[in-house]
Amino acid sequence: MGTLVWTDDYTEPFDFRVQTYQGHPVLTFWSGELLDGYGHGSYYILNQSYVEIAHFSPVGFENLGDIHEFTITSDNTALVPIYHAVTADLTSVGGANDGWIFDCTFQEIDIETGKMLFQWNASDHVGVNETYNDVKNVGTENAPFDYFHINAISKDANGDYLVSARVMDAVYKISGKDGKIIWRLNGKQSDFDVEDAAKFAFQHDARWVDNSKQTRMTIFDNGPTDTIGYSRGLLLAVDQDKMTVRLLQDFANAAKTFAQFEGSLQPIDASNESTNYMLGFGSQQFFAELDKDGNILLDVQFSKSNTVNSYRAYKLPWQGKPLTKPDIHYDMNATTAYFSWNGATDVEKWIVYTANATNSSTWTNVTSARRTGFETTIDLSDIKLNTYVRGKAVNSAGGVLGWTKAGDGIKLFDAPDDVQENSLSSSSASSSSSSSSSMRSTSTAAPTSSSATAAAPSSSATGAAARNIAWSGWREQVYVAAVVVVGGLAAA
């Protein structure tokens, strides 16, 4: 399936991915309290060393930022949504005239200064009667009616916004000048002639593929529609002159999975019309990679059913350079050493050293092994060892990345990194990998159900949980996905 690269204990992370901020790759995500189909929290940016370089909330809504979107624009601004209760007349949908709705607001914020540059409220522009949601027993102050459900926001090259509203079955183009709706695509009041094959329902992750020309759009169609009973990714041709929409290609996995909520479709290289596509199934434990014609290249189930969900799935390059030291657990009784380095992506090999004193200026190289996963296990049973054992992480060119502390089988001790090295043997030890969630006590904590997690593809899949159809040329890539346990069904 894949091996862990990095994990941390941020609470209930959502929309976890690699983006660009101020010209550098960064990790971004939301963290906070996950509620019934929305959330209250804030937004984080980490640099390549996993250091938090920005943390903010929507302006005027401290710690009330929603889970569904955190996009950084080319202007180093952030697009973020807010769900907040306001009064509304619900008689058009069978509710009270003094009812309550979740107003879906989004803001564009200058990340560096914290200044709000733009704000848009759904209730100012979209009527309650456009919704496909049922008011049922909600519509009160304690249980507002979720009539719009914003779940994707992006900004095009002209300064206008593309907004997805799940329970409207519609995508909106919003003027960046005055907030007026330029057009509606799909839904009850569509301004487009949408061919039947291109119609969608309860969608997520609407994006322009070509942000300048705005002729192709991707959408994750949760469904079901009148003709399709499973979830799929859609590549649509959008003609804003003729006001027509047609299907260029749809994308589905082999199981024809239905994801009730969440999901994503990512063109891996949006500048290339022949690019592959990454398809994530949100509330279901599947992701897939497909070629431009919808042929499945990779089809994976990464967990048991109804245990975890990954809001969106991405395939993105990432180079992690942690400031922490690598970790070692040395089991003296089993004469086994375990090596890991949370977040490091460039480790090619672990070299094992031994000495009789932690402050020794000379350490003896006794063996080495290629990194085989998040945690690499090295058998030292046939090697004569001194009192202390430690490891050195090196990259593919042999460059030193970092040294672990020294262990005596009981405790870990500080030891100098600037040392002389003696060589005992040129042989390499046998090793095995472990990405288990039960990490050794001296290692950085493994992923939990509420961790932000980056995972890298491995060269093999495990058991029936993964269906590896074509796994070639992936060694340089890193998957980035947020894995979050949901205690119950929520329309996220």
Regions found by a protein language model. Give the residues of each.
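Histidine-/acidic-rich catalytic cores in large beta-rich domains
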Residues: 1-424
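Fungal extracellular serine/threonine-rich, low-complexity, intrinsically disordered "mucin-like" regions
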Residues: 413-461
